[in-house]
Regions:
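Substrate-binding groove of N-acetylhexosamine-processing glycoside hydrolases
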Residues: 1-182
Length: 182
């Protein structure tokens, strides 16, 4: 039985897993959700940005995800994503999406969700390091350090969004300092 002809889909822009968004995963989900909505003739789509777990992630950090959904909703492709994002924010989408770096450790597969090293490294108790098995300090320390540098560079050209990149640069610097302490 059909529930109703009047169905709305509520997708998500991943900002509820700590201090850092996951626009990369949101992109993957948006592509599949858009296909499913179109195949099932669902005309109304909303994108949510939940503030679970304390709402640490800034709302504007998911602008790439929102632009992806806009492109899919209005054009059904991402051909003009970069141009439209640059017009809307003044930054390239490629630069802006670097805001995800604290969650994108070298050993993590690209298509996983819910893995949030930005949070578990930050909150790891150095006297009781139960999460050490989830990190590889020899890879993760330089990753976080490089991420801090990259985000600091982007901050200089980010205009009104500079605070997002400054916050993430500082977070990555802390994570780089802490990841090998346990």
């Amino acid at each position: 039985h059909k529930i109703s002809q009047d169905i709305t889909f509520a997708g998500g822009a991943w900002k509820w897993i700590g201090f850092t968004p996951n626009n990369h995963f949101s992109h993957l989900i948006a592509m599949e959700a858009n296909k499913a909505c179109r195949a099932n003739q669902i005309k109304e789509v909303i994108v949510t940005g939940w503030g679970d777990n304390g709402g640490e992630t800034a709302q504007f950090s998911i602008l790439p995800s929102l632009q992806i959904w806009a492109e899919l909703s209005y054009r059904n492709d991402l051909d003009r994503l970069s141009a439209h994002f640059k017009t809307n924010t003044g930054l390239s989408v490629e630069d802006f999406i670097q805001i995800d770096l604290a969650n994108l450790l070298p050993d993590l597969p690209d298509n996983l969700s819910g893995i949030n090293p930005n949070r578990y490294v930050f909150y790891q108790d150095v006297l009781c390091p139960i999460l050490d098995r989830h990190v590889t300090p020899e890879q993760d320390k330089p990753h976080f350090a490089q991420a801090a540098e990259t985000l600091s560079e982007i901050k200089e050209k980010a205009g009104n969004y500079a605070y997002l990149f400054e916050t993430q640069a500082q977070l990555n610097q802390i994570l780089s300092s802490k990841v090998d302490v346990g």
